[in-house]
A protein has these predicted regions:
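Divalent cation-coordinating acidic motifs and surrounding scaffolds
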Residues: 74
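Anion (oxyanion) recognition and catalysis
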Residues: 164
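Conserved small/polar residues in nucleotide/adenosyl-binding loops
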Residues: 178-185
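A short, flexible N-terminal coil/short beta segment enriched in small residues
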Residues: 27-44, 82-83, 88-90, 94-101
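Generic structural signal for well-ordered alpha-helices
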Residues: 78, 104-108, 133, 157-160
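Core AdoMet radical
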Residues: 57-71, 84-99, 111-132, 136-155, ...
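Canonical Radical SAM [4Fe-4S] cluster-binding loop centered on the CxxxCxxC motif
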Residues: 8-18, 24-70
């Protein structure tokens, strides 16, 4: 008879509680804390990036999600924000400017429901019309992040200045090293 002994030992995990960096912007801090609602406003995007992580069920589909919950209207978005006790929202997509009016409505509804302290940031890769900056500021957008796709900031200069002048905290998402190396290779 063979004796089998088994030892149940679980791996030991180090409890790492990394605090957000005090230099991080408010949107980053709240995301790191897990307190921001992810508002996927549309799957539509004018770019066709081959590295886009959107699945077939979201890419080029004009539908809205709050976190992973499909939402038909902003009442459902607000319900999801309440359920998670969100302190803010990050608006993303495809590209939120492909559903500009819906993005503006979402900002207004969330601010009306949760107040001015409910922090809202939005991502875009579109160098939009500078006059739209005041519309987003008036709606209550706190922060905007531009993702340069061609590694050139020139076409974004006017809208970045307009957003900043309108009181929207304005940032640029860093370009990945791989993307940068590919760009250098193609242009040399």
């Amino acid at each position: 008879m063979c004796a089998v002994s088994s030892v149940s030992e679980f791996p030991q995990f180090i409890d790492i509680e990394e605090s957000p960096n005090s230099l991080d912007c408010e949107g980053c801090i709240q995301c790191q804390m897990g307190s921001k609602l992810v508002l996927f406003i549309t799957g539509n995007c004018h770019w066709r990036c081959d590295y886009c992580p959107l699945s077939e069920t979201r890419r080029d589909i004009d539908f809205m999600y709050a976190n992973e919950r499909p939402c038909n209207d902003f009442d459902e978005v607000i319900e999801e924000a309440r359920a998670m006790r969100a302190t803010g929202a990050g608006i993303t997509g495809g590209d939120p400017l492909m559903a500009r009016e819906r993005s503006l409505e979402g900002i207004r509804r969330l601010k009306r429901e949760f107040g001015d302290d409910f922090h809202i940031h939005m991502y875009t890769s579109i160098p939009f019309k500078a006059q739209w900056a005041s519309e987003f500021a008036d709606a209550g957008l706190d922060e905007i992040r531009f993702h340069f796709l061609d590694l050139s900031s020139q076409e974004y200069k006017e809208v970045i200045e307009a957003c900043s002048d309108a009181g929207i905290f304005t940032g640029v998402e860093p370009v990945s090293y791989t993307h940068l190396r590919a760009h250098e290779t193609l242009n040399h």
